[in-house]
Amino acid sequence: MLRNKSQKELLHLSRQLIQPLLPNFHKGQAGKIVVIGGNEDYTGAPFFASHSAALVGADLSHVICEKAAGPVIKSYSPDLMIHPYLMDLDNPHLNLNNSELEKLKNLPIDEIIKTNDNAVLNKLIDELILPKVTSLLNRIDIVVVGPGFGRDPLMLKSLIRIIEEVKVLNLPIILDADSLYLVSLSPKIIANYPKAIITPNVVEFQRIAKALSIDADLSESNKDKLIDQTIEVSRKLGDIIVFRKGEHDLIVKSSKFLINEITGSNKRVGGQGDTLTGAIATLVNWSNNYILRLWDNQVVVNWSNNYILRLWDNQVDLDQEDANLLACFAASSVVRNASSKAFNKYGRSMQTSNVHEYLHESFTELFGDSIFRTSNI
């Protein structure tokens, strides 16, 4: 039903996915998000993803990161919950002798991605990392993996094991950045998991397409060919959502697709993709709540101000696929609009932190500022 809708019509449809803020809702019902990533070298990526999720409207935004990254990310914002549960091979608490450590550091990637290989890495993960991570995952609505993960063997193996655990828990998962590198090496990591979304840029998409024996030229600009390539990648991965970032964002699930042509920023700066990923997490979670009809037919009574408000029923019945695709489109729209505003102010000096200044304004401009999304009766 989304096919051939105009950008304006898609934005209008997206409004019904925006979760209202009701007085009877409790903390966490508007989204419990976790971003898993971040190491000593890369602390900005997980921050931007989790901060974006919070600014767009998630109630609780967590980061699970490597221990050295924890204090740094905590210093960026007191609003995020930081859990330094991950470890890399430089962690002094691993109790490995020098020869073991050197052997692990020189492991070929092929051996790392084998599910049941390397008893030493698996033992470290089972004893020191996974119990804490799993404990938090049991309280989460949607998971983002990959931002700032790096290429450390223990970190990469932990990422694989965490993705497996997310699938066992049947949680929605968004794969970005370094997790897409793993997908390009072993597509089976996420293939056929219906709650997966991958968010490749041009280069990441080409790597994944090549791994699936699909021809994808970096210089390709023909819209129909880009759509066909992305549909083929989605299908070969088991009909998961592929959010292909580019001049125009292309959002595909099997044969269904949406294209976002809203003007963004001409400045390409590190971190914008992480901002998008966080926004996707919040809006996809709301779209899942929409499917659960979390706020349908609810009545809000405010005796002190003498009014009664009734929430609108869903005006158009969307199925799960369309709701998730539309949520991705809405997230893309918010971030593109915010990026355009930031670029108009800062020009060439624009940074991702400037984009975050405009996320709320962009959201309000596109979807309104009504807290309840209600009507008087």
UniProtKB/Swiss-Prot annotation:
One of its GO terms (cellular component) is cytoplasm. GO terms for biological process: metabolite repair; nicotinamide nucleotide metabolic process. Its main location: cytoplasm. Keywords: ATP-binding, Cytoplasm, Lyase, NAD, NADP, Nucleotide-binding, Phosphoprotein. SUPFAM superfamilies: Ribokinase-like. Disulfide bonds: none annotated. ATP binds at residues 245-249, 264-273. Its cofactor is Mg(2+). InterPro entries: Carbohydrate_kinase_pred_CS (IPR017953), CARKD (IPR000631), Ribokinase-like (IPR029056). Belongs to the NnrD/CARKD family. NCBIfam families: yjeF_cterm (TIGR00196). Catalyzes the dehydration of the S-form of NAD(P)HX at the expense of ATP, which is converted to ADP. Together with NAD(P)HX epimerase, which catalyzes the epimerization of the S- and R-forms, the enzyme allows the repair of both epimers of NAD(P)HX, a damaged form of NAD(P)H that is a result of enzymatic or heat-dependent hydration. This is ATP-dependent (S)-NAD(P)H-hydrate dehydratase.
